[in-house]
Amino acid sequence: MLLITPDELKSYSVFESVKTRPDELLKQDILEATADIILKVGHDFSDAEYIPLPETVRLALLKLSQFYALINGDESIIKGYTTEKIGDYSYTLGDGSSLQKPDVYALIKDYVKPADPDLEGIEAKVRMRSI
């Protein structure tokens, strides 16, 4: 379920690498960001009260999606190199250390659902045996 579109992400971002990234890859980045937000808030924004999607949640999704698009699109991070030399030509690539995952908690904190109070205080015992 996409809560934002690749076109919305492209118009939000100032990074050329995000704007030129194929829509199919941006959809994967958006899904990754959506899964991250759902994990933090405890629901998937499918209830009628979240239509339209709150602006702060939308902004959080845009920020995280842009982050994932930048990380997933940076070949130098995956390959693990920072400099490369070809003949007389050399260049330096980012190592990802300056790119940090944005903290979007302040944007989504109003939408975090508390744990089910019926589950509090329940004990469970698990028996395990070695194989």
Swiss-Prot record:
Q: CDD domains recorded for this chain?
A: Yqbg
List the Pfam families.
Answer: DUF3199
- Membrane-spanning parts: none
The record describes its quaternary structure and partners as: Monomer.
Can you say what this protein is called? Uncharacterized protein YqbG
Q: Which organism is it from?
A: Bacillus subtilis (strain 168)
The record's gene field reads yqbG
